[in-house]
UniProtKB/Swiss-Prot annotation:
Protein source organism: Citrifermentans bemidjiense (strain ATCC BAA-1014 / DSM 16622 / JCM 12645 / Bem) (Geobacter bemidjiensis)
Subunit structure: Part of the 50S ribosomal subunit; part of the 5S rRNA/L5/L18/L25 subcomplex. Contacts the 5S rRNA. Binds to the 5S rRNA independently of L5 and L18.
Stated family: Belongs to the bacterial ribosomal protein bL25 family. CTC subfamily.
GO cellular component, as recorded: cytosolic large ribosomal subunit
Pfam families linked: Ribosomal_L25p, Ribosomal_TL5_C
Keyword Ribosomal protein annotated: yes
SUPFAM superfamilies: Ribosomal protein L25-like
Name of the protein in its database record: Large ribosomal subunit protein bL25
Function: This is one of the proteins that binds to the 5S RNA in the ribosome where it forms part of the central protuberance.
UniProt KW keywords: Ribonucleoprotein, Ribosomal protein, RNA-binding, rRNA-binding
One of the protein's GO biological processes: translation
InterPro entries: Rbsml_bL25/Gln-tRNA_synth_N, Ribosomal_bL25/Gln-tRNA_synth, Ribosomal_bL25_b-dom, Ribosomal_bL25_C, Ribosomal_bL25_long, Ribosomal_L25_dom, Ribosomal_uL5_bac-type
Disulphide linkage map: none
Length: 197
């Protein structure tokens, strides 16, 4: 996963009023959490944060903070992100301070590869699980995990346990959970049950 530098400013004051003023100035209130540290309140540039978590991999990009104090040079990943429902811009973000030598747990998007044989035969694709929980070192966080569905027939499914985990990663999600299924054509059951004319 790529690393990006993000400038941050420490903030001593908290509260709704302060957060509103920060947002009006184009900044996003944030809190940094981590093992062995007390939560630290900071603010980030809205544009810079949006660009840092845009594209493939999104929230799983490793961010390096550039700021005053002990957090300068700290590596973080997004733990929780609140967006404005109308403008779709970040309103608040929780960051998790990580050690690049320690494994982390993150959610990674699944990418379906190929057109299922069952869809070509008239079936419908039911994509039930769009991401899985993965454990790995930060540098091994994948942008996505491919799931080959080209050979999937009507009535067949792919479960989490069938997904090939990228090198250096372990998938933690329930192996029995259904990821994608191919359902029969609408009305197919009725056609099969109907007597021949």
């Amino acid at each position: 996963m790529s690393k990006q530098v993000l400038k941050a400013e420490l903030r001593e004051q908290t509260g709704k009023g302060i957060c509103r003023r920060l947002r009006a100035a184009g900044r996003v209130p944030a809190v940094v959490y981590g093992k062995g540290i007390a939560p630290v309140s900071i603010s980030l540039g809205q544009k810079e944060l949006s660009e840092a978590i845009a594209g493939e991999g999104g929230r799983n990009h490793i961010l390096t903070l550039e700021c005053a104090g002990e957090l300068n040079g700290a590596s973080v990943i997004v733990a929780d992100l609140l967006r404005d429902s109308l403008k779709n811009v970040p309103r608040h973000v929780d960051l998790h301070k990580i050690n690049l030598a320690d494994k982390v747990k993150v959610h990674v998007k699944l990418n379906l590869v190929g057109t299922p044989a069952g869809v070509k035969a008239g079936g419908f694709l039911d994509f039930a699980m769009h991401e899985v929980e993965v454990e790995c070192l930060p540098v091994h966080i994948p942008a996505h995990i491919n799931v080959d569905v080209a050979e999937l027939l009507i009535g067949h499914s792919v479960h989490v346990g069938q997904i090939v985990a990228p090198i250096g990663t372990a998938i933690l999600s329930d192996p029995k959970a259904s990821v994608v299924s191919i359902l029969g054509r609408k009305g197919a059951a009725e056609e099969e049950a109907a007597p021949a004319a």
